[in-house]
Amino acid sequence: MEDDDSYVPSDLTAEERQELENIRRRKQELLADIQRLKEEIAEVANEIESLGSTEERKNMQRNKQVAMGRKKFNMDPKKGIQFLIENGLLKNTCEDIAQFLYKGEGLNKTAIGDYLGERDEFSIQVLHAFVELHEFTDLNLVQALRQFLWSFRLPGEAQKIDRMMEAFAQRYCQCNTGVFQSTDTCYVLSFAIIMLNTSLHNPNVKDKPTVERFIAMNRGINDGGDLPEELLRNLYESIKNEPFKIPEDDGNDLTHTFFNPDREGWLLKLGGGRVKTWKRRWFILTDNCLYYFEYTTDKEPRGIIPLENLSIREVEDSKKPNCFELYIPDNKDQVIKACKTEADGRVVEGNHTVYRISAPTPEEKEDWIKCIKAAISRDPFYEMLAARKKKVSSTKRH
């Protein structure tokens, strides 16, 4: 017996034959519906997947910009904050900036201290918002100072220190009402404790102050009255037993960024302006970025070229030997995303569609190409986008 939908038993009545035909037609309709549903489900699944990858891509891009903003902050705090605000990564409010500094993730603590110590009105507001984020309730003064002085590195200038310690004293008294008669008392005692820390733990200070001397030094500072002796003894013992930890910069500053590069050396770079001139620059390859400096001693690079989605090729040049180029594959007219510092200190986007570079020797050229190839990272979305652009442009031509 044939086992397919065309087979009709010979002993069926006309009515039964009609019913069988209806059943088979309905079956075909249902199978078509099932297939249509499968296709719709697959389409929705693809949309959900592409939405997820779009979100993921946005997050990746955001994280990269935040990392670049942190590096800029560690080079120049004000420029770093400006970069983060301009790229929508930070709100231009003292509260948002204070929160960013308080979290301190990847930030150089000396740079935090420098920014907080600035004397312009906005920086002072950021300082107060930063201090407000510290919770000093029920901490004795030494404990509060330990917490505060660990969150940044005190700058060297007396006026900056004065502003910061004044803000600290106000916040401590706000969190612990009744401990001191005034913020002035708290301010004076805080300085006395910092000086005590230096005297007790600096090996160059031979004459170590006793607890009695510390108590005597702080007589009459509580609005003319004396502070409880027990309080002063406790503060003295706390500092004697455990010195303040001064934050070492946490390895995310520029010194660390450029400390162990993949490669560094002098190269010639062809300028991107209307007049093409070759300039000698000190190049450092690290963290999937190529940095270039005017001098090896410069703190701040003249330019930063992220290597993501770039390719590298050897090229011949009539003026210079041992040349290679960084370029965007399949997109000869697109400007490479990079930034450079102008002579007046402004950070601007680069205007190169290719970066042409000349090495001193053929061997160095080969080494640079090999190292840059290893550092280049590719974003599959970018390749997909480039392919789509190519397809669109070829469609337009036909």
UniProtKB/Swiss-Prot annotation:
Which proteins does it associate with, and in what oligomeric form? Interacts with TRIM23 and CYTIP. Interacts (via coiled-coil domain) with FRMD4A (via coiled-coil domain). Interacts with FRMD4B. Found in a complex with PARD3, CYTH1 and FRMD4A. Interacts (via N-terminal domain) with INAVA (via N-terminal domain).
Ranges for domain PH come to: 260-377
Q: From what superkingdom does this record's organism come?
A: Eukaryota
**Which SUPFAM superfamilies does the entry link to?**
PH domain-like, Sec7 domain
Keyword Ligase assigned to the entry: answer is: no
Coiled-coil segments, which residues? Answer: 10-67
What does the domain comment read?
Binds via its PH domain to the inositol head group of phosphatidylinositol 3,4,5-trisphosphate.
Quote the protein name from its UniProt record. Answer: Cytohesin-1
* Record's keyword terms, sorted: Acetylation, Cell junction, Cell membrane, Coiled coil, Cytoplasm, Guanine-nucleotide releasing factor, Lipid-binding, Membrane, Tight junction, Ubl conjugation
* Gene Ontology cellular-component terms listed: adherens junction; bicellular tight junction; cytoplasm; cytoplasmic side of plasma membrane; cytosol; extrinsic component of presynaptic membrane; neuromuscular junction; plasma membrane
Which compartments is it annotated to reside in?
Cell membrane; Cytoplasm, Cytosol; Cell junction, Tight junction; Cell junction, Adherens junction
| Its biological purpose | Promotes guanine-nucleotide exchange on ARF1, ARF5 and ARF6. Promotes the activation of ARF factors through replacement of GDP with GTP. Plays an important role in membrane trafficking, during junctional remodeling and epithelial polarization, through regulation of ARF6 activity.
Q: Where is the SEC7 domain?
A: 73-202
Provide the topology term for how it sits in the membrane.
Peripheral membrane protein
Gene3D superfamilies, A to Z? 1.10.220.20, Arf Nucleotide-binding Site Opener,domain 2, Pleckstrin-homology domain (PH domain)/Phosphotyrosine-binding domain (PTB)
Record bears the keyword Cell membrane: yes
InterPro entries tied to this protein: PH-like_dom_sf, PH_domain, Sec7_C_sf, Sec7_dom, Sec7_dom_sf
Tissue specificity remark: Present in all tissues tested, with highest protein levels in brain and adrenal.
PTM summary: Ubiquitinated by SCF(FBXW11) E3 ubiquitin-protein ligase complex. Ubiquitination induces proteasomal degradation.
* Positions bound to a 1,2-diacyl-sn-glycero-3-phospho-(1D-myo-inositol-3,4,5-trisphosphate): K269, L270, G271, G272, G273, R274, V275, K276, T277, R281, Y292, R302, N351
GO molecular-function terms, A-Z:
guanyl-nucleotide exchange factor activity; lipid binding
